Amino acid sequence: MSRYRGPRLRIIRRLRNLPGLTNKLVESKKNQVSGSDQSNQKKVSQYCIRLEAKQRLRFNYGLTERQLLNYVRIARCAKGSTGQILLQLLEMRLDNILFRLGVVPTIPSARQLINHRHILVNNRIVDIPSFHCKPKDIITIGAPKTYQSIITKRIESFAKDQIPDHLTLSLSEPKKPKGFVNYLINRESIGLKINELLVVEYYSRKA
């Protein structure tokens, strides 16, 4: 299954707010159901609940079905909680790191910067959005002038307290902001509200 490129509002109306996909907030279709209609609704199955959790994770981080399945398989082979390791793997992707630093408004925007070869990790150009960042990595945003003003305005409007503790943003060189990965992200700093165990359960027979 390819990466979704359709209307984003349609997705967040169905799956609720996804900060990585869009910064727009809308009321989900479930919340719009009137009291009279609620009585006629069928009970949601456990499969549907797990499917929705999986879809929320996939669309928020902009993954294909195959990519997410591969991440689940990697998490299963690692020591520790499969769900938490899965979230760590997704949060430590380069495109998500740029998003969490406040350099770009969404993960798709971060992916565009990376694909255009404007991002350096440890002084080397990286053009792979899924690149896995590690503690002590230094990420430099070397965007051209056309991007610099946009990035500067974005950073100025982004509250510093929104940057999670495992990351640090340095503006000592305004034209080349730098991000520092301090350590692996912990569960409390995950940007998406989700029950990761539902995703693990969804893939229990597939991974």
Swiss-Prot record:
By its UniProt entry, which SUPFAM superfamilies does this protein fall under? Alpha-L RNA-binding motif (SSF55174)
- Description of how the protein assembles with itself and partners: Part of the 30S ribosomal subunit. Contacts protein S5. The interaction surface between S4 and S5 is involved in control of translational fidelity.
- Where is each S4 RNA-binding domain found? 92-156
**Which controlled-vocabulary keywords does the entry list?**
Chloroplast, Plastid, Ribonucleoprotein, Ribosomal protein, RNA-binding, rRNA-binding
Which NCBIfam families does the protein's record reference? PRK05327.1, rpsD_bact
**Does this UniProt record's set of keywords contain ATP-binding?**
no
- Write down the Gene3D superfamilies for this protein, in alphabetical order: Ribosomal Protein S4 Delta 41, Chain A, domain 1, RNA-binding S4 domain
- What's a single GO CC term here? chloroplast
What GO molecular functions are on record for this protein? Answer: rRNA binding; structural constituent of ribosome
Q: Name one Pfam family in it.
A: Ribosomal_S4
In its UniProt entry, what is this protein called? Small ribosomal subunit protein uS4c
GO BP terms, alphabetized: ribosomal small subunit biogenesis; translation
- Keyword Chloroplast present in the record's keywords: the answer is yes
Main location as per UniProt: plastid
Record's superkingdom? Answer: Eukaryota
**What does this chain do?**
One of the primary rRNA binding proteins, it binds directly to 16S rRNA where it nucleates assembly of the body of the 30S subunit.
Q: Where in the cell is it found?
A: Plastid, Chloroplast
